[in-house]
């Protein structure tokens, strides 16, 4: 149903005809120059996009569209909650124990907050219980501070980190509204905390690309929607069925 709807919009010219080949930068360029009315953007691009738009049209205004509802009237948004990186210490290291002690020291509360957002009163300040950057010192000395983290306090870091989105009023407004709109409708990936699953590790990357390429063809009409069942059959045969089975088996056992 979604592909049929998107294909209809594409045929009617309501979706950019270059959508299948647009890059993020190209989409921003089209929106900020007034060639596109709506586009999907990451909150971290909000400040620069708004600035470029205002330069081309000083009277232009932007707004965030709330998460769309399905035909039953329910809205939802997908949230990733998986581990994206971790630190390792080689087994052959001469000072393994000292390395672990160093990592632990960096997570001590006073050390961690200073590494993350600097010193209070010098790099950041607290207003109404929220952390705000002191500019320009915060940018000058801590703009790349997150690159020095080797672990996080998962309870405190989300609050500390928001000092980074408060560097720019537009960026802050977008970030806060997007998160406000997502309250109560977030759906977490059920495989977020799963260990590596062989069939998924083997097939996911190639099938993700196959799926994306196929969806773009269906939307643009270069491949007729009548071929959807053929796409699904090939997706299953090329590893999709094995991935689904392995994921369901892990989930069933993980719930016990």
Swiss-Prot record:
| Top-level taxon in the UniProt lineage | Bacteria
Task: Tell me any Pfam family this protein matches.
Answer: SBP_bac_1
Q: Which family does it belong to?
A: To B.subtilis LplA.
Q: What is this protein called?
A: Uncharacterized protein in butB 5'region
């Amino acid at each position: 149903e979604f592909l049929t709807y998107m294909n209809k919009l594409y045929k009617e010219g309501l979706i950019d005809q270059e959508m299948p080949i647009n890059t993020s930068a190209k989409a921003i360029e089209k929106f900020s120059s007034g060639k596109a009315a709506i586009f999907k953007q990451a909150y971290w691009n909000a400040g620069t996009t708004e600035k470029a738009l205002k330069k081309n049209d000083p009277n232009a205004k932007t707004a965030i569209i709330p998460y769309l509802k399905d035909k039953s009237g329910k809205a939802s948004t997908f949230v990733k909650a998986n581990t994206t990186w971790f630190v390792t210490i080689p087994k052959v290291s001469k000072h393994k124990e000292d390395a672990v002690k160093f990592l632990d020291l960096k997570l001590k509360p006073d050390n961690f907050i200073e590494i993350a957002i600097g010193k209070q009163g010098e790099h950041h300040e607290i207003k109404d219980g929220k952390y705000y950057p002191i500019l320009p010192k915060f940018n000058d000395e801590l703009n790349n501070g997150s690159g020095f983290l080797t672990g996080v306090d998962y309870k405190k870091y989300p609050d500390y980190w928001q000092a980074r989105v408060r560097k720019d009023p537009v960026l802050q407004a977008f970030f806060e509204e997007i998160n406000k709109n997502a309250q109560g409708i977030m759906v977490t990936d059920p495989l977020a905390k799963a260990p590596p699953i062989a069939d998924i590790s083997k097939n996911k990357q190639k099938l993700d690309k196959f799926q994306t390429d196929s969806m773009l063809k269906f939307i643009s009409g270069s491949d007729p929607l009548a071929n959807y069942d053929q796409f699904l059959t090939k997706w299953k045969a090329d590893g999709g069925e094995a991935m689904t089975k392995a994921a369901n088996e892990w989930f069933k056992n993980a719930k016990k």
